[in-house]
Amino acid sequence: TDSTATAVADGSGVMTITSDGFTCKELTSAAGNVSTGSMCCWQWHCDAGDRITFNESGANPGGIRQTNATAGISIIRYTGTGSNGTIAHGLGKAPEFLIFKRGNATNIWAVWNVALGDDLKLVLNSADAQDADGAFMNSTLPTSTNITVGGASTNTNADGGDYLCYAFSSIQGYSKFGSYVGNGSGTSDGT
């Protein structure tokens, strides 16, 4: 996630997917199982839910979605339309955390959290502060059924863009999303 590069098929790191994770090939570069490097891996188990294919309809993108509402996660792959549109997420409640990445062009990892409101976003692969970007979700908060993607944003809905969106809602025992203000004392109240 420290790159804005396009997605590439690279079989140099992961060797096998297993029932409880994966194994890596032995490598001498930062692409996989290197004994002297730091690695980060994010995994979400989503196959216990529904897999839905949806068609482009007007300004609304088409694609495929795997949703596990019990765990509060929906993984959505879609093709952008270049116009303000909506995508059904299948969670049954409004997502509180979204990550978007365009795979067929150099682009940021655009991130939204419920604490940001409808006009701000963060960049996952950056130390930058939040920035105002109403085009990102067309200044529209997610609802219990849909995520809005802005047509003026290459981060979420450029015409022909190949996108991946991770949508999360807080589910007790699985996850919690919100914010906190640090106070320098080692304890803080989160919301």
Q: Positions of the model-derived regions?
A:
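Surface-exposed molecular-recognition determinants
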Residues: 1-191
